Curated annotation (Swiss-Prot):
Pfam families the record matches: AP_endonuc_2
Cofactor note: Binds 3 Zn(2+) ions.
Gene: nfo
EC class (word): hydrolase
Binding site for Zn(2+) 2: E143, D176, H210, E255
GO biological process entries: base-excision repair
GO MF terms, alphabetically ordered: deoxyribonuclease IV (phage-T4-induced) activity; DNA binding; DNA-(apurinic or apyrimidinic site) endonuclease activity; phosphoric diester hydrolase activity; zinc ion binding
Family designation: Belongs to the AP endonuclease 2 family.
Function noted in UniProt: Endonuclease IV plays a role in DNA repair. It cleaves phosphodiester bonds at apurinic or apyrimidinic (AP) sites, generating a 3'-hydroxyl group and a 5'-terminal sugar phosphate.
Domain of life of the organism encoding this protein: Bacteria
EC nos: 3.1.21.2
Residues binding Zn(2+) 3, per UniProt: H179, D223, H225
Protein name: Probable endonuclease 4
InterPro entries reported in the protein's UniProt record: AP_endonuc_2 (IPR001719), AP_endonuc_F2_Zn_BS (IPR018246), Xyl_isomerase-like_sf (IPR036237), Xyl_isomerase-like_TIM-brl (IPR013022)
Lineage per the UniProt record: Bacteria, Bacillati, Mycoplasmatota, Mycoplasmoidales, Metamycoplasmataceae
Length: 276
């Protein structure tokens, strides 16, 4: 089954109910939300989510397991200085996600900034273990990154090493097509790309895909998303990811730019699903 959707706005007054309504208007059957502003840890109480309205009207069309939650960008579980704050926040975030019944929490692995990469890697593994020990149900997904600055997890071997070191069925990977392209993985050589996923074992942990085109050439380490078919990856390659059996039942989530201050996810989803 093809599961496809986009990032949708989780905001007052309708929160979850409004977000899933927007997804359905885009002809999607999956969705991704932030539980608050992406650059902030501010959160409203779960009783404001309008979960009962969602449950009554939209539960069957987009069930909770196909609602992906993204952690805010400002946390850094790989930093020995910021880890405690990040970990405490993520434990509370998972409690809110369990209220919804969503299955996956995507998070950026963090930066090693003023620390060595090895120190940051050990801290990240420790953080993930601690968060999982204090929570239940939700699966943490480390997102593949572009390699910009001191970002962690810009190559498949590193992200798999971290996932396997955590030793939990509640840890996995979210692959971002723009990020891996910018990190130097040539998706346009599709057979070789799929071979690399198998070789590094990343495919064993892949739970969600962020489906984005890239404004930048291969290996640029820029992380600038483009609309579907308007970047260097191209529609043909992104459509292969939608339809290839290797990625069956994995939710594909668009995070592409707005056009004239409006999302065009409905058009992009239709474009991707169009068989040629």
């Amino acid at each position: 089954m093809i599961k496809i959707g986009s990032h949708v706005r989780f905001r007052k007054p309708d929160y979850l109910f409004g977000a899933i309504q927007e997804s359905l208007e885009n002809k999607a059957n999956a969705a991704m939300i932030f539980l608050g502003p992406p650059q902030s840890t501010f959160r409203v109480k779960p009783e404001n989510y309008k979960f009962q309205d969602y449950q009554k009207h939209f539960f069957k069309q987009i069930p909770p397991e196909d609602i992906i939650v993204h952690a805010p960008y400002i946390i850094n579980p790989a930093s020995p200085i910021k880890a405690q704050f990040s970990n405490d926040f993520l434990v509370k975030e998972i409690e809110k996600i369990n209220y919804i019944g969503a299955k996956f929490l995507v998070l950026h692995p963090g930066f090693f900034t003023s620390f060595t990469k090895e120190v940051a890697k050990k801290q990240l593994i420790s953080s993930l273990k601690s968060i999982l020990e204090k929570t239940k149900n939700v699966i943490l997904l480390l997102e593949t990154m572009s390699g910009k600055g001191s970002e962690m997890c810009a190559n498949f071997e590193e992200i798999v090493e971290i996932v396997e070191a955590v030793e939990s069925p509640r840890i996995g990977v979210c692959l971002d097509t723009c990020h891996v392209w910018d990190a130097g993985y040539d998706l346009k050589n599709f057979p070789e790309f799929c071979k690399e996923l198998r070789k590094t074992r990343l495919i064993n942990y892949l739970k969600v895909i962020h489906l984005n085109d890239s404004l930048s050439p291969l290996g640029s380490k820029k992380d600038r998303h483009a609309n579907i078919g308007k970047g260097f990856i191209g529609l043909e390659t992104l459509r292969k990811i939608v339809f290839d059996p290797l990625f069956a039942n994995i939710p594909k989530i668009l995070e592409t730019p707005y056009v004239d201050n409006k999302p065009i996810y409905d058009q992009e989803i239709a474009l991707l699903l169009k068989k040629v």
